[in-house]
From Swiss-Prot:
Catalysed reactions, as listed in the record: isopentenyl diphosphate + dimethylallyl diphosphate = (2E)-geranyl diphosphate + diphosphate; isopentenyl diphosphate + (2E)-geranyl diphosphate = (2E,6E)-farnesyl diphosphate + diphosphate; isopentenyl diphosphate + (2E,6E)-farnesyl diphosphate = (2E,6E,10E)-geranylgeranyl diphosphate + diphosphate
Gene3D superfamilies membership: Farnesyl Diphosphate Synthase
Family recorded in the similarity comment: Belongs to the FPP/GGPP synthase family.
Top EC class, one word: transferase
Keyword tags: Magnesium, Metal-binding, Transferase
Biological process, per Gene Ontology: alcohol biosynthetic process; mycotoxin biosynthetic process; terpenoid biosynthetic process
Cofactor names: Mg(2+)
GO molecular function, one term: metal ion binding
Organism, as annotated: Penicillium canescens
Taxon lineage: Eukaryota, Fungi, Dikarya, Ascomycota, Pezizomycotina
Cofactor: binding details: Binds 3 Mg(2+) ions per subunit.
Enzyme Commission number: 2.5.1.-, 2.5.1.1, 2.5.1.29, 2.5.1.10
Protein name: Geranylgeranyl pyrophosphate synthase olcC
Pathway, per record: Secondary metabolite biosynthesis; terpenoid biosynthesis
Keyword Nucleotide-binding assigned: no
Length: 333
């Protein structure tokens, strides 16, 4: 299914209607309350959703939407609930990007200025937080209280993972590979699991797709870390070597530091959070010297092979074309 239009998600998060304020209108000499209320509602909705609308107006790869459609080849949930889950996940993902860009001091998102540099930090945070709670309230339409339990569990895990990622960056603490992958499972895997668990809740199938989704989340993040420092397309969308400027301990950086006992140079480059291209190019040479990019490629290939084996164990290959396509996309060519 294609990316949901921004207008549809905007309508999705809009409040149901304004509260009547007859006393206020009387004091102000306003008599046509219907028109005033309509204008007020439109203005409020526009203000609240503006940062979200901005980011939704130039959509990304929609890997989560594709993942939901692919797993529905197995789970076969009703179209109405499938659309609801897609909208909720897209809304949560967009809100999380707004917050991430603030926490990471990013300048670009999908090749354009980040939302908080246009609407301000405070308004962007409020818009993202509103979207989180609106998405939660919409889950009641599924008609099963476990939907909100799943939402709460995965949003807690997502923020736990984000908290560790920020802690390592801000305290200049290099995690182990195991610690990093646990963080990725919590953070990146959160919305992947949320989508699939909600789908399983709405499905007559007893198939458990969560273990496979765990693989996809980890592969996705390692690939993203690799692309951040190697992909020309990524440079267009996010800027050159953004993880180095952010001071982030990404997968290749962790490998380089832990495979080289004399790693003071790379750690100090992270500490500087430099925007200097020459410094970042030097850091990339350090990563190349420790074979860290090759290690990423090997790890992705290994995890992809394991994911495909699990996929074959789970059922009819004729129902796995969509998931196979996602795995092919995630592979580094």
């Amino acid at each position: 299914m294609d990316q949901l239009p921004a207008a549809e998600l905007t309508n999705f998060i809009s409040p149901s209607g304004p509260e009547s304020r007859p006393v206020f209108h009387s004091i102000c000499g306003i008599h046509d309350t219907a028109n005033v209320q309509q204008k007020q509602t439109l203005d409020q909705n526009k203000v609240i959703s503006a940062p979200l609308d901005y980011l939704l107006s130039f959509p990304g790869k929609d890997i989560r939407g594709q993942l939901i459609s692919s797993f529905n080849e197995w789970l076969q949930i009703p179209e109405e609930k499938l659309s609801l889950i897609k909208r909720v996940v897209e809304l949560l993902h967009t809100a999380s990007l707004l917050i991430d860009d603030i926490q990471d001091s990013s300048q670009l998102r999908r090749g354009l200025p980040v939302a908080h540099n246009i609407f301000g930090v405070a308004q962007t945070i409020n818009s993202a937080n509103y979207a989180y709670f609106k998405a939660q309230s919409e889950l009641h339409k599924i008609g099963d209280p476990r939907a909100v339990e799943i939402f709460t569990e995965e949003l807690l895990r997502l923020h736990k993972g984000q908290g560790m990622d920020l802690y390592w960056r801000d305290s200049l603490t290099c995690p182990t590979e195991e610690e990093y992958l646990e963080m990725v499972s919590n953070k990146t895997g959160g919305l992947f699991r949320l989508a699939i668990k909600l789908m399983q809740l709405c499905s007559a199938s007893e198939k458990d797709c969560v273990p496979l989704v765990e693989y996809l989340g980890i592969i996705f993040q390692i690939r993203d870390d690799y692309q951040n420092l190697q992909s020309e397309k990524y440079i267009e969308n996010k800027g050159f070597g953004e993880d180095l400027t952010e001071g982030k301990f990404s997968f290749p950086i962790i490998h380089s530091i832990r495979s080289n006992s004399d790693s003071f140079q790379l750690i100090n480059i992270l500490k500087q959070k430099s925007e200097d291209t020459t410094v970042k190019l030097y850091a990339i040479k350090l990563l190349e010297s420790t074979g860290s990019f090759e290690f990423c490629r090997q790890r992705i290939a290994q995890l992809t092979t394991q994911a495909r084996s699990l996929l074959m164990e789970m059922g009819d290959p004729s129902q796995t074309a969509g998931i196979q396509g996602i795995l092919a996309f995630l592979e580094l060519k």
